[in-house]
């Protein structure tokens, strides 16, 4: 039961990180109608600070000593 809750949390967190990575508000034409899509920098998925935590959650090593 505990692992299924952790898996569900990791899944939700990873989906939130993907949303932040690929749906940047600066690149959205609704957020800034005057900006061109080429002016927004591309998000670097390797710079995401939550990916190591999600990896540890998925492997089950987070919290173990």
UniProtKB/Swiss-Prot annotation:
Cell compartment(s), UniProt = Secreted
Q: Where are the transmembrane segments?
A: none
Keyword Transport carried by entry? no
Q: Name one GO biological process term.
A: innate immune response
This entry's Gene Ontology molecular function terms read: toxin activity
User: Where is the major localization of this protein?
Assistant: secreted
Which tissues is this chain's protein expressed in?
Expressed by the venom gland.
Keyword terms, alphabetized: Amidation, Antibiotic, Antimicrobial, Fungicide, G-protein coupled receptor impairing toxin, Immunity, Innate immunity, Mast cell degranulation, Repeat, Secreted, Signal, Toxin
Which cellular components does GO assign to this protein? extracellular region
In this chain the AXPX repeats are located at 23-26, 27-30, 31-34, 35-38, 39-42, 43-46, 47-50
Residues cleaved off as propeptide:
24-49
Q: Which residues carry this modification: Leucine amide?
A: 62
Signal peptide span per the entry? 1-23
The family annotation for this protein states: Belongs to the MCD family. Mastoparan subfamily.
Q: What does this protein do?
A: Antimicrobial peptide. Shows activity against both Gram-positive (S.aureus MIC=1.0-3.75 ug/ml) and -negative (E.coli MIC=7.5-15 ug/ml) bacteria, as well against fungi (C.albicans MIC=30 ug/ml). Also promotes important mast cell degranulation. Shows little hemolytic activity on rabbit and human erythrocytes. Its mast cell degranulation activity may be related to the activation of G-protein coupled receptors in mast cells as well as interaction with other proteins located in cell endosomal membranes in the mast cells.
Name of protein: VESP-VB1
């Amino acid at each position: 039961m505990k692992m299924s809750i952790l898996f569900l949390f990791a899944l939700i967190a990873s989906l939130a990180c993907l949303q932040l990575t690929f749906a940047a508000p600066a690149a959205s034409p609704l957020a800034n109608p005057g900006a061109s899509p080429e002016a927004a920098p591309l998000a670097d998925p390797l710079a995401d600070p939550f990916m190591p935590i999600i990896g540890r959650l998925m492997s089950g090593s987070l919290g173990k000593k």
